[in-house]
């Protein structure tokens, strides 16, 4: 009986211990879940767009030229594909960069041209979705008639190591457009976008530098994207400089018609989009499109464009300007253009 009592007492102790441990674990779950939630939100908004799910899986082989009156019906939900006459082709021109440089504005301005057909959403094919295959990619494109240009824009291509080789594999004749902007203001704009979606981030200064105002942290993507010369070096291994057009993000704001005119020349298009299509919106501090014939009102980019930047201490700005200066000068030499950032 004594042995039986001893076993009974042991079972009671274990049951009590198990209850205590369960209570402690439940108490830890709430803050742990909150941490996981915040980290997930940061990753969602700080990383480039994710690969959209495919409607059906195409054969992973390069796609031959599409015969007339046929089309691939493979596409991703959420990426609208225009219907109608014509056929789907691989893009002859790509806006490959850079994030927060003005790529969305340029794409919307170019879409005014009757000979430009462009995918509105960013497919992220050459950086995140390449395993879907070229047939899948072509199936996303809008239909075009002979003489029209197919385009898409994904700004993260410019900083993706594998993108130049992959694009060259699709077509070595692809024309490449890079919209660049002062890398300091670009980084602040990048941070402002992430902060608007993920409140509670560390300060810009804390992310840009190690140990206060120590070395610049080039591991942070907002800083790394602005090393334009380094990224261009990678692209020039596959494409000659003549295949590139570098658009000034600053001039795209101050003189949109002039910059869009250069792009139309580069694409071999007639200058259809001119200053008559633009007006400057003083509230947004950004050019908007005048209303087209039959349209009810002028069209500006979304509310996320032209958002106010957080205040960044002048010492931080000056340190970053000094850091970028040699990279900027090399970029000027490589492109033959002085963008006036120094």
Curated annotation (Swiss-Prot):
Pull the Lumenal topological domain ranges from the record.
50-342
Source organism per UniProt: Mus musculus (Mouse)
- What is the tissue localization of expression for this protein? Expressed in liver and kidney, followed by heart, brain, lung and testis.
Supply the PANTHER family for this chain.
Answer: HEPARAN SULFATE GLUCOSAMINE 3-O-SULFOTRANSFERASE 6, HEPARAN SULFATE SULFOTRANSFERASE
Give the binding site residues for 3'-phosphoadenylyl sulfate: 100-104, 181, 189, 305-309
Question: What taxonomic ancestry is recorded?
Answer: Eukaryota, Metazoa, Chordata, Craniata, Vertebrata
Identification of the protein by name = Heparan sulfate glucosamine 3-O-sulfotransferase 6
Family stated for the protein in its record: Belongs to the sulfotransferase 1 family.
Its Enzyme Commission number? 2.8.2.23
Query: Entry's Gene3D superfamilies?
Result: P-loop containing nucleotide triphosphate hydrolases (3.40.50.300)
User: What are the BP-aspect GO terms?
Assistant: blastocyst hatching; heparan sulfate proteoglycan biosynthetic process
| Residues that, per the record, bind substrate | 122-128, 153-156, 220-221
Cite the ranges annotated as topological domain Cytoplasmic: 1-31
State a single Gene Ontology molecular function. [heparan sulfate]-glucosamine 3-sulfotransferase activity
Q: Which cysteines are joined by disulfide bonds?
A: 288-300
Query: Gene name on record?
Result: Hs3st6
Q: Segment Disordered: which positions?
A: 56-75
């Amino acid at each position: 009986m004594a042995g039986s009592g001893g076993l009974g007492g042991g079972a009671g102790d274990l049951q009590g211990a198990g209850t205590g441990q369960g209570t402690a674990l439940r108490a830890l779950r709430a803050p742990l879940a909150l941490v996981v939630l915040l980290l997930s939100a940061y990753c969602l908004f700080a990383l480039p767009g994710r690969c959209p799910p495919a409607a059906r899986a195409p054969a992973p082989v390069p796609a031959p030229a599409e015969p007339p009156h046929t089309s691939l019906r493979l596409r991703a939900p959420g990426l609208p594909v225009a219907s109608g006459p014509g056929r789907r082709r691989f893009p002859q021109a790509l806006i490959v960069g850079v994030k927060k440089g003005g790529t969305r504005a340029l794409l919307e301005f170019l879409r005014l041209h009757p000979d430009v057909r462009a995918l509105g959403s960013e497919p992220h094919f050459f950086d995140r979705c390449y395993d879907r295959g070229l047939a899948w990619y072509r199936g996303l494109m809008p239909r075009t008639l002979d003489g029209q240009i197919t385009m898409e824009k994904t700004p993260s291509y410019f900083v993706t190591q594998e993108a130049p080789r992959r694009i060259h594999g699709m077509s070595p004749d692809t024309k490449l457009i890079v919209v660049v902007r002062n890398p300091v203001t670009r980084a602040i704009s990048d941070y402002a976008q992430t902060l608007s979606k993920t409140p509670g981030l560390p300060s810009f200064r804390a992310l840009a530098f190690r140990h206060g105002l120590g070395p610049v942290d080039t591991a942070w993507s907002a800083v790394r994207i602005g090393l334009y010369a380094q990224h261009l070096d990678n692209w020039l291994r596959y494409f000659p400089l003549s295949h590139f057009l570098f658009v000034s993000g600053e001039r795209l704001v101050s003189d949109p018609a002039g910059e869009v005119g250069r792009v139309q020349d580069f694409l071999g298009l007639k200058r259809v989009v001119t200053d008559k299509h633009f007006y400057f919106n003083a509230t947004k501090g950004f050019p908007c499109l005048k209303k087209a014939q039959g349209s009810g009102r002028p069209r500006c980019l979304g509310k996320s464009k032209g958002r106010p930047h957080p205040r960044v201490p002048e010492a931080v700005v000056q340190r970053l300007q000094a850091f970028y200066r040699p990279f900027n000068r090399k970029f000027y030499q490589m492109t033959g253009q002085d963008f006036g950032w120094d």
